[in-house]
Amino acid sequence: MGIQGGSVLFGLLLVLAVFCHSGNSLQCYSCPLPTMESMECTASTNCTSNLDSCLIAKAGSGVYYRCWKFDDCSFKRISNQLSETQLKYHCCKKNLCNVKEVLENGGTTLSKKTILLLVTPFLAAAWSRHP
């Protein structure tokens, strides 16, 4: 890789590092008690550093909203913590992402950061091949 290709790669990595750095804590919807299915939780909180994702879990007619540790985002851990035997859940890592629509749609969305992380190596490889 020539000096120009290395400079371009360094520039891309620098932009990526600045873009992905987040100095603020994650913000999630959080209600101390489960809300009725027909209602939304509108209270938000800044999560502590050890709780790195937002959780929404539907169990029966109640919906739980809170900060959650992403590594603990499994049926077993969530059902044990919430004392629920049947639930549908979703964990996410974007501010205020724990909304009922993610449970209703059942899909996982890619964030802009994820897309940038996936595209950057291809762009760097393409630019390094230019003479």
UniProtKB/Swiss-Prot annotation:
Residues of the UPAR/Ly6 domain: 26-111
Signal peptide positions (record): 1-25
Residue ranges of coiled coil: none
SMART domains: LU
Localisation per UniProt entry: Cell membrane; Secreted
InterPro entries recorded: CD59, LY6_UPA_recep-like, Snake_toxin-like_sf
Keyword entries, A-Z: Cell membrane, Disulfide bond, Glycoprotein, GPI-anchor, Lipoprotein, Membrane, Secreted, Signal
Pfam families: CD59
Lipidation (GPI-anchor amidated asparagine): 105
GO molecular function, a single term: complement binding
SUPFAM superfamilies reported for this sequence: Snake toxin-like
Disulfide bonds: 28-54, 31-41, 47-67, 73-91, 92-97
Propeptide segment residues: 106-131
Post-translational events: N- and O-glycosylated.
PANTHER family: CD59 GLYCOPROTEIN
Protein name listed in UniProt: CD59 glycoprotein
Record organism: Saimiri sciureus
